[in-house]
Amino acid sequence: MATAKYGLEPIGPQKPDALVKFDVDPSNTAIYRGDVVELDADKGVAQAPATNVDNIGVVVGFYDADGLPALYYPAGNAAGYTAIVNIDPHQLYKIHYYHASTALTAADVGSCADWVVGTGNTTTGQSGAYVTSLGTGAAGLYVLGLYEQQG
Protein backbone atom coordinates (compact mmCIF):
# COMPACT_ATOMS: atom_id res chain seq x y z
CA MET A 1 0.00 0.00 0.00
CA ALA A 2 1.60 3.24 -1.12
CA THR A 3 -0.75 5.70 0.57
CA ALA A 4 -3.04 5.87 3.56
CA LYS A 5 -6.76 6.41 3.72
CA TYR A 6 -6.88 9.65 5.70
CA GLY A 7 -3.60 11.06 7.08
CA LEU A 8 -4.03 12.36 10.64
CA GLU A 9 -7.73 12.41 11.52
CA PRO A 10 -8.90 14.05 14.77
CA ILE A 11 -10.48 11.77 17.37
CA GLY A 12 -13.15 13.38 19.51
CA PRO A 13 -14.24 17.01 19.55
CA GLN A 14 -11.96 19.76 18.35
CA LYS A 15 -11.71 22.90 20.49
CA PRO A 16 -13.09 25.82 18.45
CA ASP A 17 -10.39 28.19 19.74
CA ALA A 18 -7.70 25.75 18.51
CA LEU A 19 -8.88 26.00 14.88
CA VAL A 20 -6.80 28.81 13.41
CA LYS A 21 -6.81 30.23 9.88
CA PHE A 22 -3.45 30.57 8.14
CA ASP A 23 -2.60 31.69 4.62
CA VAL A 24 -1.12 28.89 2.51
CA ASP A 25 2.37 29.43 1.10
CA PRO A 26 1.57 29.72 -2.65
CA SER A 27 4.91 28.27 -3.74
CA ASN A 28 4.24 25.04 -1.89
CA THR A 29 3.32 21.52 -2.96
CA ALA A 30 -0.27 20.32 -2.61
CA ILE A 31 -1.65 20.13 0.94
CA TYR A 32 -4.55 17.92 2.01
CA ARG A 33 -6.83 17.56 5.05
CA GLY A 34 -4.90 15.51 7.58
CA ASP A 35 -1.47 16.80 6.55
CA VAL A 36 0.92 18.14 9.18
CA VAL A 37 2.00 21.72 8.44
CA GLU A 38 4.69 24.15 9.55
CA LEU A 39 4.91 27.93 9.39
CA ASP A 40 6.94 29.08 6.41
CA ALA A 41 8.41 32.45 7.50
CA ASP A 42 5.96 35.19 6.46
CA LYS A 43 4.46 33.17 3.60
CA GLY A 44 1.93 31.07 5.54
CA VAL A 45 1.78 27.33 6.17
CA ALA A 46 3.48 24.61 4.15
CA GLN A 47 3.32 20.82 4.25
CA ALA A 48 5.80 19.60 6.87
CA PRO A 49 8.38 16.97 5.89
CA ALA A 50 8.25 13.60 7.67
CA THR A 51 10.93 14.22 10.30
CA ASN A 52 10.07 17.87 10.94
CA VAL A 53 10.09 19.07 14.55
CA ASP A 54 8.63 22.61 14.38
CA ASN A 55 5.12 21.70 13.23
CA ILE A 56 2.26 24.11 13.86
CA GLY A 57 -0.58 21.58 13.61
CA VAL A 58 -2.79 19.47 11.34
CA VAL A 59 -4.94 20.82 8.49
CA VAL A 60 -8.67 20.20 8.97
CA GLY A 61 -10.04 22.35 6.12
CA PHE A 62 -9.44 24.93 3.40
CA TYR A 63 -10.98 28.00 1.78
CA ASP A 64 -10.10 28.99 -1.78
CA ALA A 65 -9.31 32.52 -3.00
CA ASP A 66 -13.06 33.32 -3.20
CA GLY A 67 -13.64 32.22 0.41
CA LEU A 68 -15.44 29.04 -0.61
CA PRO A 69 -14.70 25.69 1.06
CA ALA A 70 -12.08 23.67 -0.84
CA LEU A 71 -11.18 19.98 -0.55
CA TYR A 72 -7.43 20.59 -0.68
CA TYR A 73 -4.77 23.13 -1.67
CA PRO A 74 -3.56 22.43 -5.23
CA ALA A 75 0.13 22.81 -5.98
CA GLY A 76 1.38 25.21 -8.62
CA ASN A 77 1.30 28.69 -7.11
CA ALA A 78 -2.45 28.84 -6.42
CA ALA A 79 -2.76 32.12 -4.50
CA GLY A 80 -5.27 33.21 -1.89
CA TYR A 81 -5.97 29.89 -0.16
CA THR A 82 -6.53 29.70 3.59
CA ALA A 83 -5.92 26.59 5.69
CA ILE A 84 -7.84 25.81 8.87
CA VAL A 85 -5.25 24.25 11.19
CA ASN A 86 -5.87 22.50 14.50
CA ILE A 87 -3.08 23.81 16.75
CA ASP A 88 -4.23 22.05 19.95
CA PRO A 89 -1.21 20.10 21.29
CA HIS A 90 -3.62 17.87 23.27
CA GLN A 91 -5.80 16.84 20.30
CA LEU A 92 -5.72 13.09 19.69
CA TYR A 93 -5.46 11.75 16.13
CA LYS A 94 -5.65 8.43 14.41
CA ILE A 95 -3.37 7.61 11.49
CA HIS A 96 -3.10 4.60 9.20
CA TYR A 97 -0.29 2.16 10.06
CA TYR A 98 1.10 -0.05 7.33
CA HIS A 99 3.90 -2.59 7.61
CA ALA A 100 4.32 -5.59 5.31
CA SER A 101 4.84 -8.13 8.11
CA THR A 102 4.26 -6.53 11.54
CA ALA A 103 0.85 -5.66 12.97
CA LEU A 104 0.37 -3.19 15.82
CA THR A 105 -0.29 -4.66 19.27
CA ALA A 106 -0.90 -3.27 22.75
CA ALA A 107 2.85 -3.63 23.37
CA ASP A 108 3.42 -0.79 20.86
CA VAL A 109 1.66 1.76 23.07
CA GLY A 110 4.33 4.22 24.20
CA SER A 111 6.32 3.93 20.97
CA CYS A 112 6.98 6.89 18.73
CA ALA A 113 6.93 7.29 14.97
CA ASP A 114 7.42 9.71 12.12
CA TRP A 115 4.79 9.87 9.41
CA VAL A 116 5.44 9.16 5.76
CA VAL A 117 4.22 11.93 3.45
CA GLY A 118 2.04 10.05 0.98
CA THR A 119 0.12 11.26 -2.06
CA GLY A 120 -3.17 12.89 -1.13
CA ASN A 121 -6.48 12.14 -2.81
CA THR A 122 -7.73 14.97 -5.06
CA THR A 123 -11.26 13.49 -5.13
CA THR A 124 -11.76 13.36 -1.35
CA GLY A 125 -9.17 15.95 -0.26
CA GLN A 126 -7.74 13.48 2.27
CA SER A 127 -4.04 13.32 3.09
CA GLY A 128 -1.89 10.37 2.11
CA ALA A 129 0.22 10.46 5.30
CA TYR A 130 0.71 7.20 7.18
CA VAL A 131 3.06 5.45 9.62
CA THR A 132 5.21 2.50 8.57
CA SER A 133 7.59 1.94 11.49
CA LEU A 134 7.80 2.56 15.23
CA GLY A 135 10.72 3.42 17.48
CA THR A 136 11.71 4.47 20.97
CA GLY A 137 13.62 7.69 20.23
CA ALA A 138 12.36 11.17 19.48
CA ALA A 139 9.76 11.52 16.74
CA GLY A 140 6.78 13.64 15.74
CA LEU A 141 4.07 11.16 16.80
CA TYR A 142 3.47 8.99 19.85
CA VAL A 143 1.33 5.86 20.07
CA LEU A 144 -1.08 6.47 22.95
CA GLY A 145 -3.41 3.59 22.11
CA LEU A 146 -4.86 1.44 19.36
CA TYR A 147 -7.98 2.75 17.62
CA GLU A 148 -10.71 0.16 17.11
CA GLN A 149 -12.35 0.77 13.73
CA GLN A 150 -15.94 -0.49 13.51
CA GLY A 151 -17.26 -2.08 10.33
Q: Where are each of the predicted segments found?
A:
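Surface-exposed, low-hydrophobicity beta-strand/loop segments enriched in small/polar/acidic residues
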Residues: 1-151
